[in-house]
Amino acid sequence: MPCAMELPSTPDELAAQQADSAALKDLLKDPSRWHSIPLLNYTPLHKLKDQTLVRFRGMIQDMMDPEIYLERYEVKSADGSKRVQEGKYRDCLKIANGEVIDYNADGNVHGERRTMFVVSVPGLNDWSKEHEKLCCPQIDLASLGQSPSSAKKRTIVGEEEAMDVDVASETTFKRPCLKEIQKDSEPVGASKSSVLGSDYLINSPLPDRPSMACMVKVYEEFDTYQLNSLVDFVGFLSVDASLDAATLEIDDCENLSELQAAHPSPFLIPRLHAFGVQVLPHANPLLDKSLRQPTEICEETYPTHLAVHKDLRMLLKLCLFDDDLAAEYLLSHLISTVYSRSEMQSIGKFALNLCNLPKNCEAYATKLYQILELLLPASHYMPMTLVTLNTAAFAPKKDYETNKLVSGVLQLAPHTHLVLDETCMQQGKLEANGVHAVQHLAHLINNQELKCDFQYYQIDYQANIPVLVLSEGRSMLPSDFVLPINADSKAVELVDESLKAAHHYLQPSRLQQFRKYLTTARTSGFNVSEEHTEMIQQDFVDMRKANVKSNADDLHGLLVLSRLLGIARGKDTLDKETWQLATEFEAKRRQRIQSLPKSSAQLRN
């Protein structure tokens, strides 16, 4: 039965609905309720009022220290009367002119909230951003009753409401009231030099592809949030100018850097007080029901799963020098995911090394990546040059001066495809940073874990980042599957024409099919019946008899490959045909490896 309740538009409305929190949670489960909420990722701040209902989508990049705040407090007026004011979902305590807060009142209630530092999805590809923006509701400034310029200054000149701002929390520091700020004729913060730059404060994992940042304050279920997870928050925007550390009384501040990192300008990094959240299973906006999809997307008809699979495999074959086996393995890689974990391994990962790339194909790796980024919601291309390895920050590192987890290029959201290009490597010396970079990459590939450096210790955080390595020889990095490309000589000559043809083939309607297919396949379930488990066990025994080198890793690889081959063909259960196809492909792959020079073939398969 549809819920008659509406989403609250102000913190006070939300406080009034708290008694029926179950109904509010049910309301938030309806994805259509999210459609009309402005998406902060694509809505300029000057179009939004303070305390507007908004949403923000991104990756949890850091989790800040707990904050104690006044959840409910008593206010005294000049005539001696008292009232109770709600402090939840606000940064600044709300009092009218002539009122004071009684900090010693018995009825005061303190609460705890946590701040999540969230960045827009690192590596989100252009087509994903454009589609999210297309789904974002347009804000009519007239409906807000103000012009853009007044919206930008609302917290500074908002005295028409006869409201003032006092202390956010007596346990932190005193914020000046709006009238005190207003007395200063200079722009806020103009007289104080900036300690930290905006790039450091925003903390984008991929500096050459900067993210937007938002500090999201959550009020419950703190333990359910995980670092690097994809989330979509709904709550109240907080852009009061007094939140900026540059406006604070800082004479007694021992660490100015930490103060500024914790309280950056809200116009650089807005705050959002969340009362609703959904963990996103993927970053593909085409399949997100909480986004209002364009009519043409909803009504478009699509061919069968098998037909799309056939077309996509043909496209990949065209891009891979007419190598059908390479197309099968690359497609399996593109739909792979870690679907289970044990103490010893991450099950389902499919790190792929496509090696033996022709040396005379200039910039082939970047051209192949340009095709892949059109298909994937999020991905990142990394040239494995000495400069990159020796200078880039790969793993997150805690900065105790600012109490921030400074991001690294490997801090990516789940299912962000990482493409490593070893074809651009040159001879030279790896410095200490380069050695650590290779170690971090190897650890990510082998364990699907990201090491975070807290200086005195390290913590492993779970990751789910498919890694594709493109190389001429065997990669220096480990992988689950190494596949030497068997390039057709004619296809090598025509590779540029083939890649141009691939771009021409990817018309908008076909792109939509491929994008939906890849995400749907990756999130599909797959089962192995008891009958086929016995078949697999017997086949493995036969394999061991025929080849003494076969081990448990080989069996695990076959299981992962057969699962992906089945899912790619629209199956949800393993059958004999798919299992035999996987064993056939693996036999061909191993035969290719044996044909490599001995120095390469002796390496781990």
From Swiss-Prot:
It comes from the Eukaryota. Its main location: nucleus. InterPro entries: MCM_complex-bd (IPR019140). The modification Phosphoserine is found at S147, S150. GO terms for cellular component: nucleus. GO terms for molecular function: chromatin binding. It is found in: Nucleus. Keywords: Cell cycle, Cell division, DNA replication, Mitosis, Nucleus, Phosphoprotein. Pfam families: MCM_bind. GO terms for biological process: cell division; DNA-templated DNA replication. Belongs to the MCMBP family. Interacts with the MCM complex. Associated component of the MCM complex that acts as a regulator of DNA replication. Binds to the MCM complex during late S phase and may act by promoting the disassembly of the MCM complex from chromatin. PANTHER family: MINI-CHROMOSOME MAINTENANCE COMPLEX-BINDING PROTEIN. This is Mini-chromosome maintenance complex-binding protein. It comes from Drosophila melanogaster (Fruit fly).
